[in-house]
Amino acid sequence: MKFPLLLALLVGGAFALHLSSEASDSKSPLVDESLPREAEISRPEVEESPPGEQLMSLEEEEEEEEEEGSGSEGALGNEGAVSGQDVTDENLQSPKEEDTTSLMGDSGFKTGRYLLVRRPECFNKAQLVCRSCYRGTLASIHSFSVNFRIQSFVRGINQGQVWIGGRIVGWGRCKRFRWIDGSSWNFAYWAAGQPRRGGGRCVTLCTRGGHWRRSGCGKRRPFICAY
């Protein structure tokens, strides 16, 4: 009586073990297929800078290096000092009276007086004229109202742009805009696409619209002195 019962228990145990083994084998392919998905989910994402911005920056650097290397622009130090290689105080000629127009006594310019010099000069020489002849500097602009009034002041001349006192100092990632008189760069009125798509290290004001543009510092333009 005991032997048939023992035999039945042994057969039942072997059958249960066989079913467990088949179930384990049938699940293993699903586990293997899921492993790559887990790896992909856990892999950290890497952010990359937009290629257009990177290429644009490289193009700007190449343009500036070409301009500086050609000698067409005077060297501007990190503090905005004017180079004396091209002109000195001794051989500087003051602009003729008919080449200048003064804007003073206007309620819109309580912080200073402005002078338009129509005789075109490069940026460095324009700054030297402002400093030596009028004891001032190329104009710095800190509000839209002043920018608008200066643009209204110069829009009648037969030139598209005039120098103001903004320029780039530093190189590469350390580049920044500064006013040549040392005042805070707390306002800007750039034209569309500027300053990123502009070339040159000096800043002009457009006589139509009053927007600002970057320009090669060696170009000769009329300019605005503040004193």
Curated annotation (Swiss-Prot):
Record flagged with keyword Glycoprotein: yes
GO cellular component, one term: extracellular region
Domain C-type lectin: start-end pairs: 128-227
The protein's name: Bone marrow proteoglycan
Region (Disordered): 21-105
Gene: Prg2
PROSITE patterns, A to Z: C_TYPE_LECTIN_1, C_TYPE_LECTIN_2
Span of the signal peptide: 1-16
Gene3D superfamilies the record matches: Mannose-Binding Protein A, subunit A
UniProt keyword terms in alphabetical order: Antibiotic, Antimicrobial, Disulfide bond, Glycoprotein, Immunity, Lectin, Nitration, Proteoglycan, Secreted, Signal
